[in-house]
Amino acid sequence: MLTTSPEVYAAVKDLRVVRKFQDRQISTDHLEAILDAGRWTGSSKNRQSWVFVVVRDRTQLDRLAQCGDFTRPVHSADLVIAPIRLPDGYDWDMGRVSQNMMLAAAAVGVGSCPITLHRHDDARAVLGVPADHGCQWVMAMGYPDDAAEREARRKNPLSGRKPLEELVRYDRFA
């Protein structure tokens, strides 16, 4: 049975990427809430084919930042969470688990930014992940630097979303 909740819909609509963070550690309670939201994410055939690697060590974060082309948020983040796909898992599920963690982060006042790791083999080496496991992205997390975020939005205001008429097709693409 589904429970209706306008708050969930609002959370999805209001979620924003945060690229600059305060120099402040995420509390244990907040981190556990974020990780637990990942744990509760649905998955194909309930496989739960993931492991979450939490990286706080600055040297590790710097090494991980070299594995992608657009990793600047890693440098000010308190931590990153790397969702690792186990061999029997699916990328679809990894996207679901990442989005749930980002929504949970926002719910406790923690900002997040999804970051693609373009050099998967390098990322696996940095994190000690076996070759048959997936390591394609991380989520940089921290408490938002509100002043920096306001300035970034002023320089590049949100453009909103395309109307549904441009995005939705019924029964066939064309």
Language-model segment annotations:
Residues 1-174:
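Acidic, surface-exposed loops and disordered segments
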